[in-house]
Amino acid sequence: MEKKETKSESEKTNKQDNKNTKSQKKENLNLVNSDKKIAELENEISNLKDLYLRKQAEFENFRKRLEKEKDNFVKFANETIMKDVVNFLDNLERAINSSKKSKDFDNLLTGISMIENEILSIFDKKYNLKKFGENGENFDPSRHEAISIEEKEGLKNPEIVEVYQKGYCYNDRILRTAKVKVAQSKN
């Protein structure tokens, strides 16, 4: 009977060993799979870090490029108007040189008036810069600054009788009010 018990115990031990071996193999397989998964995840993390750093560098380069473009835009925004100003300066220089040769001040005055009209015309057409403040205009406190006031008979509305300095507006925004003398009714 002892042999039977030993045999039975031996079979149990073998079965137990087989179970343990299977369990160990499963565990080892799980560990190998886990190690593979960890390696894959670490590789993915590394790739994502690289991608993040590249995108961050690209964004920084884009930001710097945008800043440089903005600086250049601001720097050269007035280039077109400066080209026009240079042409006006050329015309003024010609008028000055002409006046040195000839003492005809009437022609000089005519030439300078032509230059002023050319400047105003180009600024009006190209840049929407307009001059205002003429004798006889109705006084408008948002566009005119009254430097002095005189009383006058028979006026319905205050009007400009003398202009000390012209006003200018750019795209309908007042750059400078006209400085004027205003006449108003005695009432």
UniProtKB/Swiss-Prot annotation:
Q: Which Pfam families does this chain map to?
A: GrpE (PF01025)
> A GO molecular-function term, please?
adenyl-nucleotide exchange factor activity
Which parts of this chain are annotated as the region Disordered?
1-30
The UniProt entry, under SUPFAM superfamilies, shows: Coiled-coil domain of nucleotide exchange factor GrpE, Head domain of nucleotide exchange factor GrpE
Subcellular localization, per the record?
Answer: Cytoplasm
Q: What keywords is this UniProt entry annotated with? A: Chaperone, Cytoplasm, Stress response
Q: CDD domains this protein is in?
A: GrpE
A single GO BP annotation from the record? protein folding
The answer to keyword Signal applying to this record is no
Q: Does the keyword Chaperone apply?
A: yes
GO CC terms, sorted: cytosol
InterPro entries under this entry? GrpE (IPR000740), GrpE_coiled_coil (IPR013805), GrpE_head (IPR009012)
Return the PROSITE patterns for the record: GRPE
Disulfide bond entries: none
UniProt similarity note:
Belongs to the GrpE family.
Function of the molecule: Participates actively in the response to hyperosmotic and heat shock by preventing the aggregation of stress-denatured proteins, in association with DnaK and GrpE. It is the nucleotide exchange factor for DnaK and may function as a thermosensor. Unfolded proteins bind initially to DnaJ; upon interaction with the DnaJ-bound protein, DnaK hydrolyzes its bound ATP, resulting in the formation of a stable complex. GrpE releases ADP from DnaK; ATP binding to DnaK triggers the release of the substrate protein, thus completing the reaction cycle.
- Cited PANTHER family: GRPE PROTEIN (PTHR21237), GRPE PROTEIN HOMOLOG, MITOCHONDRIAL (PTHR21237:SF23)
What subunit structure does UniProt give? Answer: Homodimer.
Report the protein name in the record: Protein GrpE
UniProt organism field: Borreliella burgdorferi (strain ATCC 35210 / DSM 4680 / CIP 102532 / B31)
Which gene codes for it? Answer: grpE
